[in-house]
């Protein structure tokens, strides 16, 4: 039986770890993402979910900083934010996280996601944004697909984490 493990999230925009409130950055800053990752490690977290909000929303990126977080902290990292293509999966994995979390938008090219899973195995997880029983991808890519059909395809492709 698999075990549920909750991952604390570090959302990064403009080089700072930020607090989100209902999806908005209005809640303020936590400061350095490296310091936040270290504090989660000291509190006993085995993993963090590290998100590049700027890349996810198409307003820049924080790749160098996130690579430093991955290198300089002992906590295991699931990297997320703007990972919507095979090239983005490869670039994300090259930064050194344990795994990347592919955005729902990438499912508009589900064959590419399945090929990446075939190449990288459990290092590729898939995020599904769902409303009811339909995908609800930001930007409309893949929006409206039946979640159960998508789960069937991902399961057949060997996706271990959704």
Regions found by a protein language model. Give the residues of each.
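Charged helix-capping and loop-helix junction motifs
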Residues: 29, 33, 60-67, 110, ...
């Amino acid at each position: 039986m698999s075990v549920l493990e909750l991952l604390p999230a570090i959302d990064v925009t403009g080089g700072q770890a930020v607090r989100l409130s209902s999806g908005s950055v209005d809640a303020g800053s936590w400061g350095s993402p490296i310091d936040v990752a270290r504090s989660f490690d000291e509190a006993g977290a085995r993993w963090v979910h590290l998100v590049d909000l700027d890349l996810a929303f198409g307003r820049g990126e924080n790749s160098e900083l996130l690579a430093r977080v991955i290198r300089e902290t002992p906590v295991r990292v699931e990297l997320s934010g703007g990972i919507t293509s095979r090239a983005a999966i490869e670039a994300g994995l090259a930064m050194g996280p344990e795994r990347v979390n592919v955005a729902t938008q990438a499912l508009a090219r589900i064959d590419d996601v399945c090929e990446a899973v075939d190449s990288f195995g459990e290092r590729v997880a898939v995020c599904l944004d769902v409303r009811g029983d339909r995908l609800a991808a930001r930007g409309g890519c893949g929006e409206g697909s039946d979640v159960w059909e998508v789960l069937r395809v991902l399961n057949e492709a060997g996706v271990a984490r959704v």
